[in-house]
Amino acid sequence: AKKAADDMAGLLINKESNIEPIPIIYGVRRVGGVRVLVSTRDASGGDPNEYLYICLVLCEGDVHSITDIHLDDIAITNSKYSGLYSFNVHTGSDSQTYDSLLTEANSGWTNTHRLRGVAYIAMRLKWDADVFSGVPEITALVNGRKVYDPRKDSTSAGYDSSLGVSSQRFATPSTWTFSVNPSLCIRDYLSNTRFGKGLAGTKLDDSAFGSAATDCDVTTSFYSGGSASKLFDMNAVLQTDDTLFENVQIMLMGCRGFLPYNQGVYSLRIDKSRSVVYAFTVDNIIGGISITGESKENKFNRINVKFANSAIDYQPDSATWPDAGSTEESTFLAEDGGTLLVSDIELPTCSNYYVARDIARVILRRSRNALRCSIQVTSEALQLSVGDVVTVNHPTPAWGDKPFQVEEITLNYDGTCSLALLEYDSSIYTYDTSAVETTYPD
């Protein structure tokens, strides 16, 4: 838990390096950056080294905007900095030109230093001993990458005319727009050729990604009297020195996503309450059933989630479920013989307390309904997808239409299929309306 908080706090500091990996920002985050240039210039006819020049790289581009710049945790618009700064922001387009401020510095920075594809701040500061004690820490609020939405592309299988936009095109990034929708961000990461997997559009099921995006747009009231808000947003800083698998897992966890791979094509599904799509009985189950019960190692009665909270300017925060002293806590502890079973989870894509709390709740509830089984069935199971809900009716375990969720589908050499199934309870996805409003200091 401490490491998670340290990692999040580390995103707000400035580093100096010419080999530091450049992160990717999806959604909205406050970040520091990497100083790739620190130089000075004498004032004309004045003091030596009076002007300090900084080039602070923030993330991969092209991002939507860079705003609300702070120096040493104080807004740059504060009167204490009046007359002491000039800056330019560059959102990281592939066609951006050089910054004229930086060419003033005694550093060899020229008009060929364009940092195309990189979002950065060019800053000039005038020395004032009453204001600065050294090189200030700079942070900025970044509205991250512009992403493609297949629902807004009239040529896409995922097109949704009800959204009123038809002009986006996957092959034309200038038509893309900023979004915090997890499905669209995951699709962007999978298709990006510079820092992602570089998948062609034909390898992505845009009908599925569009449906998942619509699922992520569903709103709920986080507490009594609260306004409707989305339960799934993506506000993440991904590290490009982490593996593709690690980053995709981070993104999926924040939206309860599955990423099935069928016949060479990736799709996305959001884990939610679903209807049963297929029933398995002795007529299509071949052989016996292998059953694995829940294990104490993976069963919890308390989940702590670490996240960067937008309500406190993206500082590290935590959410816990169930609440201390609650009926749920007492019930779970009684069922577990009074033993506290705790899991600490880092949620890098989340910036909202209520969302973090609800994800903790779903993870905990699933851990307590974690019966698994494996069955061999007839080839009709090939029509299923990971995330589908099925029922199993079989006399051996005395199951009558017991619901399960498909975790894995394997085609066997003899034409049959093997399914890995997880016990399914649709009630766990209903938002916990007992949440109370949390207040934060200004």
PLM feature spans:
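Polar, S/T/G-rich
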Residues: 1-255, 262, 308, 315, ...
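Long hydrophobic segments that form regular secondary structure
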Residues: 311-412
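Surface-exposed loop/edge segments in extracytoplasmic proteins
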Residues: 75-80, 275-278, 314-316, 400-401
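Acidic, low-complexity/disordered segments
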Residues: 286, 386-442
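Conserved structured core elements
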Residues: 52, 63, 180, 184, ...
